[in-house]
Every structure is written in structure tokens, then in C-alpha cells.
């Protein structure tokens, strides 16, 4: 090998505030150690990272560093203290005096292989922050009013129990009148909400490595890539050990339909939730009740968002009575009601402080309803492409974009880059140990970086943006790097007011 680098798998065995402990010496080398993160696809219209993974095996036999059988089996008496699912885990690579944290996450699966006389190993997989984002459901997060994508993203991340190690959020280009209003708390994950935000902004969100902590959550607005002309690396076919190329009809679209969602907003407060039952509460007890907002005209059938929610008022928003039908003694003053309002649901904490049981005969939530009733589609067609290749339709939803003109602008941009065939370089792979240049490229380049790739057989000689990365520590000690790439030409549009932005309609097209 021309150059070498050292890799470490480390864990925080005493919690997220503790020191990092290396377990590299016990990593089994019968198979590779593999880390993947970022957008693991070159497909167009992919703006959000996939769940990143780190896969490795640990020596669970007496031959490990502790000389203990079961050292990496959580139910074994000799298990390493702190080793279990949820343990923070990272992969770092040190080269030429610099350390790069390529993956940071938490153990998601720990599977000891049973059998005293078999291959005593523990198969491990860690997930990056997107694993938490894919599991955590939005809960009682308020509607975001007149917020950019980065501001809404920050509000979402701040609501989570597990947050990324660090974040770098550029200022979004769109200000959304309303967002987080058309989600459903009970089913919508953070990852799904990130997709809705990015699809509306047309920006990118992924996790990248760095030289500080790794696991950096990054948001690039839709203007970041067109304004980034700095090449981080240049590779040719002599550097590559593998590349994947495609030229398919499925890669082109000649009819583009972008869907915007104008909102209807109540001028004044409406009743968005009414409790349909009359539960009885014993003295000195409490109860939690969750209500979901719906269209007052289609009660319970059409979910809506709610803004400017009003604190519950006795007699108006809640009443309690000794009789189920409300015809007995008014007990409202015996009760307290606290409401936590979200963008599409409310959670009540109701307490009966009295000495007698009572029925909840009225419980309702009032606020300004937000209605997503009539989405508007903006369409663009390339007739010449349709004549040649038939109809290839792309329908794309922009849930928080309420302006059909913005959708029309983006449709006009897409119809300028998608209707003609193109040879798509999807992935490239190279071995870092071949040269200093390649090792440096593999360690420095992260999702969002601009690179130049040349391949003689296919005739490809273009610039690309790296979408996602894969790092493989092979059994033979070499370090393989794989990049998932998207053509930089798809970001070659003109942002008005930027000097040297090329010739409109010749080497670039109007931005949006």
C-alpha cells in the first residue's frame, strides 16, 4: 500500500456525556466494517438523507481483549459495562495527523451468535441520527407561521429527545406561511416531516462527517449548490476500481407537474375539536385526553391544522356535571383543565379536585382552522421530447409551498433539464491506500461536496455533487470509498445578481 491510515470504532459506554472507549482491537476482520450515510441514491428529486448505518462484528470469545467469553453479550454476566443497544458509537479514521469522524450514531442491534463451539462473535449495527428521525413522531409541535425551512427544521429537531451531535443550517430561500399544519402527530415521523420541508424548499438535508464530532446535521438551501463552484476532488478512471453508469428512459421526464398547497385560514376562532363522550372522573383523579383537529363542517372526517389556539375557558370550552346528561349539579369549578396545543392536535390534562365524582360534559378546542382543500398543479411539457420518447410524467408534491407561481417556476426549471436522455454516473468507488490524493479525497469529501469525475470508456467528464458516502474497511486492511453522485449540471441555473453566472439559455437556465 502506498499510504496507510488507522481506523477506530469507539463507544461511549457511560452515556452521551462520557469518554469514548475504543473497541477496535476486538472488531472481527472475517468481514468488512462498513459505514454508509447521506443520500444513498443518484435519483433526481431526492433531497433527504437515508438512515445511515455502521456494520461491524466484535469478538465475543475468550480471545478478545478482556479474555472473557460473553464480553459483548448484553445478557452475559461478563458483558462489558455499558455495551447494549442505544450505546453511542462512532467510526473515525486518522491520516497524516488528522482525524476524520466519518460516522456517529447509536447501536440499534446487538446480536451475539450462540454456541460455545461455534464462531463466537457479536454482529452489530449502529444507526446515525436519521435512525432517530425515522422513529420519533412529531408530538404537539405548534404550527410554524412565516418560517423558513431552516427555522422549521430547527423547531422540529429541538422537539426531539435525541438530537444530532451538531448542526449547520443555511438560511432557506422560501418563507412558508404555514408549515407543520397538515401532518398527523400520531403517524408522522421527523424523517417524513423533513422530506415535506425539503420538497417544499427544494433544498438538501443530510448527515455528514467532520473533524470534530461527526454526525453533523446539514441543511443546504436550494441556492447553496448553484453557488458552490469549488471542486473538492478530481478523479479519473485510473483512480477508480468501480463505477455504475445508466442511460435509461426512466431517467428522463418530459411532462412535469408540481403541486402547491394554498391554505384557507379562518378569520376568527372555530371549534376544531369536541369531545364526543362524557367520561366520569372519580374524586382526586386526573386524566389525559388527546383530541385531533378536524374541519367543523366535516367533523371527524377531514383533519385540519390549527393556529392561534385559545386557552380553555370554563363554561365556554369545558363543563363538568354530576349527571351524564348535564342536567345535574354544575361541578366545573371542581376541575382544572390544562391544554397543550400542537399544530393538528391537543392534549388535555384534566383533574377532578373535588370530593365527588363528575362527568366531563363539554370539552372543546378553539382556534383558527387551516385548510388544505384545493391543491394547485403547475405543469410544463416538452412536446418535442414527448414526440420522441412518449409521455414520461413526473408529479412532485410541495406540501408547504402555498404559491402556485413558485411551483410554476420550478416546473419551468425542471423541464429545462429532465426531458433529454443523459448518461448518468451513479456511483464511483476507489481505494484510498493507493495514493495520498485518493486517501485525502475519501476522507475530506462529504455529502454536498462538488467533485470532477472523468471516465474514458463512457466519455463522462463532468462535475458532480456527492449525495452520499460509503466507507469500507476491507479484510485486507485497505480502505474503500464509494460516492453516490448527482450531476452538477442539474444545479446550473442562474441566480440573479451573482457575477459570472454564465449565459442564460446557453450554458445555464433561469433559477427559481
Describe every region a protein language model picked out.
Residues 1-147, 151, 159, 181-202, ...:
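Assembly/oligomerization scaffold segments
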Residues 51-53, 102, 119-121, 253, ...:
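Extracytoplasmic
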Residues 123-127, 138-142, 324-409, 442-512:
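Acidic, low-complexity/disordered segments
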Residues 131, 159, 169-175:
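Extended compositionally biased segments used for macromolecular assembly or nucleic-acid engagement
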Residues 163-172, 199-215:
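Short, well-structured beta-strand/strand-turn elements
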Residues 173-183:
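Surface-exposed aromatic
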Residues 221-226:
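Short edge-strand/loop segments of extracellular domains
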Residues 243, 251-276:
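Polar, glycine-rich mid-to-C-terminal structural blocks
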